[in-house]
């Protein structure tokens, strides 16, 4: 009676597969006329979370070249106070 335990579940069982999701396409590669400008906070806000963090490229869908440009533009916009450094809900 002392060894009456629930049966252990194996962790190597079949896993549920994620449904296939279409790969996001970099909007800057798709539309060559759209440019990344640090003086345009409206465009940059799309790539910043509400807490003020830069959204990673696996979520935003940017290619690595444009993600680096976005990151630099966001940092420049923060430096000249066009974008807040922290989100609107942050307290210090």
Curated annotation (Swiss-Prot):
Region Disordered, residue ranges: 1-22
A GO MF term: structural constituent of ribosome
GO biological processes: translation
Keyword Ribosomal protein on entry: yes
Gene Ontology CC terms: cytosolic small ribosomal subunit
Matches recorded under SUPFAM superfamilies: Ribosomal protein S18
Keywords on record: Ribonucleoprotein, Ribosomal protein, RNA-binding, rRNA-binding
InterPro entries xrefs: Ribosomal_bS18, Ribosomal_bS18_CS, Ribosomal_bS18_sf
NCBIfam families referenced in this protein's UniProt entry, alphabetically: S18
Function field: Binds as a heterodimer with protein bS6 to the central domain of the 16S rRNA, where it helps stabilize the platform of the 30S subunit.
Assembly notes: Part of the 30S ribosomal subunit. Forms a tight heterodimer with protein bS6.
Record family assignment: Belongs to the bacterial ribosomal protein bS18 family.
HAMAP family in UniProt: Ribosomal_bS18
This protein's name: Small ribosomal subunit protein bS18
Organism this protein belongs to: Citrifermentans bemidjiense (strain ATCC BAA-1014 / DSM 16622 / JCM 12645 / Bem)
């Amino acid at each position: 009676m002392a060894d009456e335990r629930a049966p252990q579940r194996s962790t190597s069982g079949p896993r549920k597969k994620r449904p296939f999701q279409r790969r996001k396409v970099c909007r800057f590669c798709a539309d060559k006329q759209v440019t990344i400008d640090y003086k345009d906070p409206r465009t940059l806000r799309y790539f910043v979370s509400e807490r003020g963090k830069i959204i990673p490229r696996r979520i935003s869908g940017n290619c690595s070249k444009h993600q680096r440009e976005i990151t630099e533009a966001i940092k420049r916009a923060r430096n000249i106070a066009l974008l807040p450094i922290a989100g609107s809900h942050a307290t210090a």
